[in-house]
Amino acid sequence: MITKPIKNVARKKRHAHVRRTITGTPERPRLNVFRSSKHIYAQLIDDVNGVTVAAASSLDKELKLENGGNVEAAKKVGELVAKRALEKGYKTIVFDRGGYVYHGRVASLADAAREAGLQF
């Protein structure tokens, strides 16, 4: 019997492989992206101390989004997480795409964060 591969299992495998090399430090935290079908989430993580430094998602009340699962929502989340990171004094980060393809919502979040002032 042929079984269809599950996309999320393959994504988690890719993410685990990348996480062996990418770590966030107190000076340069890791910008992690999680994408669901209805929303997108981004958080800056200091892996040395195990602390989330800043976070933003399409569920935030500040954004007042009707649809959190599109490219425009990802762009606004990228701007918001960059604003929160800059307020806390972080300018350079490490981008962690979470095993997702750098395309669509993930790419627009990254581009918006770059345009808002984060360097990666």
Curated annotation (Swiss-Prot):
One of its GO terms (molecular function) is structural constituent of ribosome. Gene3D superfamilies: 3.30.420.100. One of its GO terms (cellular component) is cytosolic large ribosomal subunit. Keywords: Ribonucleoprotein, Ribosomal protein, RNA-binding, rRNA-binding. The keyword rRNA-binding applies. InterPro entries: Ribosomal_uL18_bac-type (IPR004389), Ribosomal_uL18_bac/euk (IPR005484). GO terms for biological process: translation. Pfam families: Ribosomal_L18p. SUPFAM superfamilies: Translational machinery components (SSF53137). This is one of the proteins that bind and probably mediate the attachment of the 5S RNA into the large ribosomal subunit, where it forms part of the central protuberance. Belongs to the universal ribosomal protein uL18 family. Part of the 50S ribosomal subunit; part of the 5S rRNA/L5/L18/L25 subcomplex. Contacts the 5S and 23S rRNAs. This is Large ribosomal subunit protein uL18.
